[in-house]
Design a protein with these regions (language model features):
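Cell-envelope and extracellular/periplasmic
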Residues: 2-250
């Protein structure tokens, strides 16, 4: 695929440190979105835009100043609100440099829908390649997904293998065999299978794959999505994981 006509670049800009944001609705962000699918527009200071240091690859593969909601033109079937991406970026920018966020998450998606060859997977990889083409360097994949896979025992049983395959596929297709991947252990979903899913996520043992536990973060009234404040906290936890475990080796 030729991205040469799609990417707006500025050769004077330093190389962007690229972070792929992927998974389902809690990565896309539902913070501040009410039951009537209306976002309250509240942006905490931790999620503030920074026109010099935090950018976003939009749906048209152009860089723009990143601001909430990060996934508004990516996860288009639902109203997006605050997710963890902006608080993460603000927390790492002073150490990591100019940040390029690549939002790819889509609400309500199961891990099998992210298999190589499917639309979601190919879109994620193509967006990541487009970001690199414009002068960026991929630093990590942030992954928050799994609620949809608590629907049945079969889904739970297949999750570990599907997630490990996804990790190996992404690394191979991006040519980054040691790509850091920070996944989030879910805290919502079908209660019957939730704890088993969390055990699976926390137990994935692949080099440069770590897990941040969302346990204790506040859920909205729907008991599925994180509140705005919880998303801010999650972004900070993801940032600490990256800074403490991966920044030096990158």
């Amino acid at each position: 695929m030729d991205f040469s006509n799609s990417i707006q670049t500025n050769e004077a800009n330093p190389t962007k440190q690229i972070f792929i944001l992927s998974g389902q609705s809690n990565m896309a962000g539902r913070g501040g979105v009410d039951k009537n699918q209306h976002w309250d527009g509240v942006v905490p200071p931790e999620c503030a835009a920074d026109s010099c240091k935090i950018f976003r690859l939009n749906a048209h593969l152009s860089w723009e100043v990143a601001r909430e909601p990060l996934h508004h033109d990516i996860d288009t079937k639902k109203i997006c609100g605050v997710g963890p991406g902006m608080s993460f970026a603000n927390a790492v920018k002073d150490s990591a440099g100019v940040i390029g966020l690549v939002p790819c998450a889509v609400g309500g998606t199961a891990i099998k829908e992210w298999a190589r060859g499917g639309h979601l997977y190919e879109n994620m990889v193509n967006r990541a390649r487009a970001a690199v083409h414009s002068g960026g360097e991929i630093k990590a994949l942030l992954w928050y997904q799994g609620e949809s896979d608590t629907a049945s025992q079969d889904d739970v049983d297949c999750y570990k293998g599907n997630m490990e395959t996804l990790i190996h596929s992404v690394r191979a297709d991006l040519g980054l065999p040691s790509l850091p991947i920070i996944q989030v252990a879910i805290v919502s979903g079908d209660k019957k299978y939730l704890e088993k899913m969390r055990e699976i996520q926390k137990g994935i043992d692949i080099p440069n794959v770590v897990c941040v536990d969302a346990e204790g973060l506040q859920l909205k009234e729907d008991n599925l999505h994180l509140t705005t404040e919880a998303q801010v906290q999650l972004g900070h936890s993801l940032a600490q994981a990256y800074l403490n475990l991966f920044l030096a080796q990158n």
